[in-house]
Amino acid sequence: MNKELVLVVDFGGQYNQLIARRVRENRVYCEIVPYTTSIEDIKEKAPKGIIFTGGPNSVYGENAPRVQKELFDLGIPVLGICYGDQLMAHSLEGEVTSPEKREYGKTDVNLDNSSLLFKDMKEKDQCWMSHTDYISKVPKGFKIIATTDECPCAAMENVEKKLYGVQFHPEVEHTLFGKKMLKNFLFNVCNLKGDWSMSSFAEQQIKAIKEKVGDKKVICALSGGVDSSVAAVIVHKAIGKQLTCIFVDHGLLRKDEGDQVEKIFKDQFDMNLIRVNAQDRFLGKLKGVSDPERKRKIIGEEFIRVFEEEAKKLGNISFLVQGTIYPDIVESGTNTSATIKSHHNVGGLPEDMEFKLIEPLRELFKDEVRAVGEELGIPHKLVWRQPFPGPGLAIRVLGEVTEEKLAITREADAIFREEIAKAGLEEKIWQYFACLPNIQSVGVMGDERTYCHTIALRAVTSSDAMTSDWARIPYEVLDKVSRRIVNEVKEVNRIVYDVTSKPPATIEWE
C-alpha cells in the first residue's frame, strides 16, 4: 500500500514533534527529516506536502540552516512556520528584518479568509507568536494574507506554486484556529485523502520487521508497560516464536506487577517469556547512588547486561526490541533540542551494546501507541495501563534507593491507584503515582510525636506527554487517599499533592 506522505523538515524548533502529531491527527502519515536532506532524497520519498518547522536561528546567522532553492520548484506544496516562513522568504529573495522589539505570546491576527489556508475562518483571531525577525518584504509572486500590529507579514502565499508561510505557530493550542489551518493546508492545498490509520501502521511495521529479521532470533525488553507490550505484540505477530521476551524483575516494580506481567504474556499471548529475578543485583548497583541521572544510566546499563547474559544462554540473538516512543527521543535530546533528562530507552544504552535495535513505536505518540494496541487486540485494561518509566520506582524514590523506601512507595502508590480506579478516574487522568521525596517531617499520631516520611502524589492530564497539566482530582478522593496512606503505611505521616504543570516541571520527579 502506497501511503500519502508529508515531510516535516526539522530546523531545530521546540514544537517539531507537535507539528507531526497535528498532521497525524488528520490521518495523514508524516516523517520528520533533517533540513540537510537532499533534493534527491526528497524526490525519492515523493511527499505530497512539506512543512518547514520553526527554529532558534536567524536567516542571517553564519551557521543558519538552509535548504536548496530548487526545493521550491518541485511542484510540492510547502508550508513554512516561523523560521521556516522566514527562510522561504529569504531563499526566494524577499526581505527579512530584525525589529526593535520581538513578538512573543498570544497575539491578535488579521486573516484573509479568501486564502485556501484560512478558508472558513474568522477575519480576526488569536495566534501564538514567538519570533524576533520578521518578513518586511515578500518575494515576487507572493502576497500577504495575515497581519498583526507588530508584524506586517504574519502569513504569505504564492498560490501558483502552492507555497505558504506563517510567522505564528499553528501547531500549539494557543493558536485557536491552528488545527483548522493545518487541515486546510493538508486537504485544500495538498489535496490529501487522509486514509492513514493505526491498522495500516501495524501492517507496515509487521511487514518491515519480517523483512528485517528474516530467520534470525530476537529478544524483547519487556516491562509490562503499554509501550513495551505493544512493541512485543507487533514483533510477535511478525515473527512468532523467533521472539523471546525477557522480563527483568529488578525489584523496582509496582505492587504485584511482576506476577501480572508473567501471567498475561505467557498465558494469554503464548509468548516465549523468561523472567529474570534481579532485585539484589540492581539494588547492589544502586547502593549509595542518589543522583537521578546516574540512577537512570546504571539501570539502563544493567538492563542491557542482563539481556546480553540471557541472550548468550539462548544463543545467536541478533536483535533487541524496545518500546521507545517519540517523547522519549525528544526528551533525550537526540535531535537539535536540549537534553532535559536521559531516557532509559535512549540515553542509558551502553556504547558496546551487542544487539541491533528494533523500535517499532519510535515514531508514535502515546495515544497512537494505545490505538495500535487496540487494533492488535491487546486487552483494553493493559492498553490503558498507567505509563511507568523503565527505571521504575528508582526514580520515584528520591535520593538513595533502599528496600525499605521501595516498600513504602509501593504501598502508597497501590492505595493511590486503587482509589483513583474506585472514583472512575483511571482513564481520565493521563498518569498518576506516588513518590517518596527525601524528606521527613514532624507529626503527631496517637498523642505521640512522629518523625516520618512524606509521600508526594502526582497526577497529570495530557494526550502525548509532551506537555501536561496537573489533574484536578476531587478533594474527597484526595482526602480518602491521604487518610488511607497515613493509616496503612506506618512510616508515613504527611501527604502532599503536586500542582505543577509540564513545563516547567517534568511529569516524573527524577
Curated annotation (Swiss-Prot):
The active site is at C82 (nucleophile), H169, E171. Gene3D superfamilies: 3.30.300.10, 3.40.50.880, HUPs. It catalyses: XMP + L-glutamine + ATP + H2O = GMP + L-glutamate + AMP + diphosphate + 2 H(+). PROSITE patterns: GATASE_TYPE_1, GMPS_ATP_PPASE. GO terms for molecular function: ATP binding; GMP synthase activity. ATP binds at S223, G224, G225, V226, D227, S228, S229. One of its GO terms (cellular component) is cytosol. Coiled coil: none annotated. It is an enzyme of class 6 (ligase). Pfam families: GATase, GMP_synt_C, NAD_synthase. Residues 5-195 form the Glutamine amidotransferase type-1 domain. Pathway: Purine metabolism; GMP biosynthesis; GMP from XMP (L-Gln route): step 1/1. InterPro entries: Class_I_gatase-like, GATASE, GMP_synth_C, GMP_synth_GATase, GMP_synthase, GMPS_ATP_PPase_dom, NAD/GMP_synthase, Rossmann-like_a/b/a_fold. Keywords: ATP-binding, Glutamine amidotransferase, GMP biosynthesis, Ligase, Nucleotide-binding, Purine biosynthesis. Its EC number is 6.3.5.2. Residues 196-385 form the GMPS ATP-PPase domain. Homodimer. Catalyzes the synthesis of GMP from XMP. This is GMP synthase [glutamine-hydrolyzing]. The gene is guaA.
